[in-house]
Amino acid sequence: MTSVMIVLQAIVPQHWLSRAIGKLAGLSKPIWLKNALVGAFMHRYDIDLSVAECDDATAFPDFNAFFTRALRADARPLAAADWCHPADGVLSQRGDIEAASLIQAKGRRYRVDELLAGSVEEAHRYRNGCFATTYLSPRDYHRVHMPISGRLVKTRYVPGDLFSVNAATVQRVEGLLARNERLVCFFETDHGGVVVVLVGAMIVAGIATVWGGRELPGASAIRESVWSAEEAPSFEKGEEMGRFFLGSTVVLVTEAADLNWCDAPGDAVEVRAALSG
């Protein structure tokens, strides 16, 4: 059955479907439809609004506002560790970068330069570094926060597929995280270069950043933005940097090689909690 679902994902019009879902999720009227969508989603995924800034399911202007809801200020305290988790979810993989490649799933690897959609020379900087991959399920908080303090120097929006990024698909689709549409964000930090990659997926209706707004799926070419040292926005560890409009994955790539992991692959993790002690 899993193989059938993957074949279906490959043949459906992924970007059209994602854009259509995005339009539906952005509807504020009729109110009964908006509330029905939110209510059905809450029931299906057992959503807990007690930690949200707004705990009234009917108060959100549209489904997107509900899905990208903010948490209460005290819901995710910031860890004292040097590195914190960038998102709520499951730590699907983490470890050292070996032979310029990362682990996607057991028996499957993909190259750093493929993930970044850049040159081998650009990826060479991270050859001795570390990586961590966090899968965000539909029930998770879908804002992404800085794993460490840093200065944004470049972003690269990469068009691609929109396969689901659940465990079954990641296990079976070769190079999935380097094939899906994604936003690659490069930062300079006190611990060297850091890349935060926001990976799109089936029915993900867009990726947004706090500095550039929303990127809709279906771009026809790579789009790159570069900031000078004087113009580059800076972010503190734990500060919000972006969000997903429906599910996905965050891949963290570091030049630093000395991360002392606090969690094992498969562990549920919370944003702003300690990633490396």
Model-identified regions with their sequence ranges:
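Contiguous, well-folded functional domains in the mature portion of proteins
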Residues: 1-277
